[in-house]
Design a protein with these regions (language model features):
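Membrane-embedded transport module
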Residues: 12, 95-176
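Conserved ATP-binding TGD loop and adjacent catalytic N/P-domain core of P-type ATPases
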Residues: 1-123
């Protein structure tokens, strides 16, 4: 339930697609805080695939977490797929990432880290483009001494490294 709350706080919609009996799936959905209308039981692999494709057709990006043999096709179809550590080899092979253990509580942290990483990479690229677009032409036109442009490039690289070190810090609420 805590993982579902945290994922919702990150702006994600949660769906349960399971091959288990519908009654059991609905009970688990209510227990963890997923609406019964977003919990589907007795799904075949094709049912899961159809539901994911329907969400994608609505413009949604799908992150799928699975562990079973029947999850292979839907894991391959999702934009991002995660197999739990104890997943069958087929599910692990079709996944982008294998999460060690079966702790879904690590999923919100994983998503926060991925978002932060994308943001930092984007900022680093923007900085590099800015620096190169401004200072390389100045050096080529000899309006900036080559040694100063070289020093600036070294400082720029150092800035990118230091800026990227933010990724090593624990996130808010995460233990070090």
């Amino acid at each position: 339930a805590s993982a579902v709350r945290q994922l919702r706080a990150l702006g994600l919609d949660i769906w349960i697609l399971s091959g288990d009996r519908a009654h059991s799936v609905h009970r688990v959905a209510q227990w963890v805080g997923v609406g019964v209308t977003q919990a589907w039981g007795e799904c075949t692999p094709q049912d899961k695939l159809d539901r994911v494709r329907a969400l994608q057709a609505q413009g949604k990006r799908v992150l799928m977490v699975g562990d079973g043999l029947n999850d292979g096709p839907v894991l391959a179809a999702a934009e991002v797929s995660i197999a739990l550590g104890g997943a069958v080899p087929l599910a692990q092979a079709r996944s982008d990432l294998v999460m060690m253990g079966a702790q879904l509580l690590t999923l919100p942290t994983l998503i926060q880290r991925a978002r932060l990483t994308l943001r930092v990479v984007g900022q680093n690229l923007a900085w590099a483009l800015f620096y190169n677009a401004l200072f390389v032409p100045l050096a080529l036109l000899a309006w900036l001494p080559a040694w100063l442009a070289g020093l600036g490039m070294a400082v720029s690289s150092l800035w990118v490294i230091v800026h990227s070190m933010r990724l090593a810090r624990p996130l808010r609420g995460e233990e070090a």
